[in-house]
């Protein structure tokens, strides 16, 4: 009998059985009759106990493609394609992404017909190029990375400073990508190892992540970036790290960077926020502002960090201070998606920053007011448009989880993209391999897409590899009939397009 074809769109993440790709086998109904020669039972046997339900995930991420990320954390590169058991019985076509697409996701990737760079690669290889010939090795803020990815900053929030962050650190090291450690880790959790009542010692949250990364990091790739905000500066976090012998291997190999945090995409203009119990709030009140926003009888309080104050001159002086006082560490700076992001980025590069990170309004966080999550900050696509051709290393974060979104950011000028919520959800799904599988799937998509554009490195990508849908039509109040120029939303690449 011929299996009928169905015409359907591929799921955003393949719908997989619990055992990947195992075909479903019909189960015959149980025979309840008494076999010949068997005496009847006086009572039916007790049913076998039901299997214990799988533990519920520790993390949820509303508004984020959590289901698709978890599928990639389980299946790796297999999740890039539809379920192979449907091959031959289903016809596939495009499907809209789940949930509302932002401006970056609405951009189409547009391979050309004529590909001179593919011809150059063919001559170089003496054969037809394939997608495996794409080299994803990237220089990120002074580090060498195997992929144009890095692990975004997890700070002192509960989700970002526990065991999941340690698992993510270890897997990022094995992937050969840099890791950023977020703000307020030392003011909240301390720095040195602390003794327990039994005489054992426990590592601080920051050192636990550093040691997990160093234990798994290959030689010559990756690196650790440590953020500092106002409260961190009061604790002299960078001085502690720079003088700690534990960080000597990173300094000696040029794999340590310090990142000045000026803001974040999820709450631009505000400092970090966490929810703490009343006992912890009393301890933290010496360093942070604590507010009773949840009610006088609530067991929790809001801990707030100050955002810091920056002008063009203050930022320039801060970056020069970092370069002069910590000459062996790379200098990074992170901006929220402010309306003057282009001016801020140019100022940072002029002051010698090795990397400038822009965190789009789609970026995640451990805690923020809803009005900021929904209404504040520039979308990542607009922030990249305003920056235009970067004058140095530009890094982008904000809802990155798959290769298409990553490629759009790279084509708009970013050198690499950060994985934040996607990384935490992946290690929540599989603490040992989830992030690696997620990165493997993303890397495969990047190789496929970059080669389809007739290019073979991420640095070769440019805005003309993209097409943005036109805005709703509005009549031109002063049309120029002599002009037939089509104005797109993104600037044309400068000659050479420095990346």
Predicted regions and their residues:
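Conserved, well-structured core domains of diverse proteins
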Residues: 1-7, 54-146, 160, 170, ...
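Intrinsically disordered, low-complexity proline-rich tandem-repeat tracts
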Residues: 5-57, 477-487
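Anaerobic metallocofactor- and corrinoid-dependent redox/one-carbon enzyme cores
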Residues: 58-83, 230-237, 241-257, 261-284, ...
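Short glycine-rich or small-residue beta-strand-to-loop segments that form or flank ligand, phosphate
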Residues: 149-155, 180-182
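Conserved, mostly hydrophobic/aromatic
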Residues: 151, 172, 356, 409, ...
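Active-site-facing alpha/beta catalytic cores
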Residues: 169-170, 174-321, 325-348
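Glycine-rich phosphate/ribose-binding loops and adjacent secondary-structure elements
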Residues: 298-444, 473
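Extended, intrinsically disordered, low-complexity segments
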Residues: 434-499
């Amino acid at each position: 009998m011929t299996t009928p074809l169905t015409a359907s769109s591929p799921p955003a993440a393949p719908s997989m059985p619990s055992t990947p790709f195992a075909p479903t086998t019909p189960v015959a109904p149980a025979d309840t009759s008494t076999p010949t020669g068997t005496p009847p039972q006086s009572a039916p046997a007790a049913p076998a106990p039901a299997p214990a339900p799988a533990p519920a995930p520790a993390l949820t991420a509303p508004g984020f493609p959590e289901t698709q990320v978890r599928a990639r954390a389980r299946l790796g590169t297999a999740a890039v394609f539809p379920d192979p058991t449907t091959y031959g019985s289903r016809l596939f076509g495009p499907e809209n992404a789940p949930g509302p697409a932002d401006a970056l996701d609405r951009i189409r990737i547009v391979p050309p017909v004529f590909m001179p760079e593919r011809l150059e690669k063919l001559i170089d290889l003496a054969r037809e190029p394939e997608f495996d010939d794409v080299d994803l090795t990237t220089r990120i803020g002074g580090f060498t990375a195997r992929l144009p990815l890095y692990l975004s900053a997890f700070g002192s929030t509960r989700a970002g400073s526990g065991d999941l962050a340690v698992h993510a650190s270890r897997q990022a090291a094995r992937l050969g990508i840099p890791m950023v450690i977020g703000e307020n880790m030392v003011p909240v959790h301390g720095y040195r190892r602390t003794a327990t009542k039994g005489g054992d010692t426990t590592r601080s949250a920051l050192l636990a992540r550093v040691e997990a990364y160093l234990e798994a990091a290959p030689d010559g790739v990756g690196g650790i970036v440590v953020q500092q905000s106002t409260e961190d500066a009061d604790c002299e976090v960078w001085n502690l790290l720079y003088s700690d012998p534990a960080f000597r291997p990173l300094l000696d190999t040029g794999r340590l960077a310090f990142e000045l945090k000026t803001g974040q995409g999820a709450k631009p203009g505000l400092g970090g926020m966490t929810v703490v119990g009343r006992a912890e709030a009393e301890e933290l009140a010496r360093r942070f502002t604590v507010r009773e926003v949840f009610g006088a009888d609530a067991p929790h309080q809001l801990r707030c960090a100050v955002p810091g104050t920056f002008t063009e001159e203050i930022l320039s002086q801060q970056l020069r201070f970092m370069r002069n006082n910590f000459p062996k560490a790379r200098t990074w700076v992170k901006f929220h998606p402010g309306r003057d992001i282009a001016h801020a980025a140019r100022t940072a590069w002029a002051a010698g920053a090795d990397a400038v990170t822009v965190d789009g309004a789609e970026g995640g966080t451990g805690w923020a007011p809803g009005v900021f999550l929904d209404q504040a900050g520039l979308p990542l696509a607009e922030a990249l448009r305003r920056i235009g051709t970067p004058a140095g290393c530009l890094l982008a974060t904000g809802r990155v989880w798959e290769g298409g979104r990553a490629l759009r950011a790279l084509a708009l000028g970013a050198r690499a993209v950060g994985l934040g919520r996607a990384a935490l959800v992946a290690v929540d799904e599989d603490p040992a391999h989830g992030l690696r599988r997620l990165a493997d799937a993303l890397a495969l998509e990047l190789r496929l897409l970059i080669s389809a554009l007739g290019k073979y490195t991420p640095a070769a990508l440019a805005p003309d590899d993209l097409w943005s849908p036109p805005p709703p039509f509005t009549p031109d109040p002063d049309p120029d009939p002599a002009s037939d120029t089509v104005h797109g939303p993104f600037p044309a690449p400068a000659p050479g397009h420095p990346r």
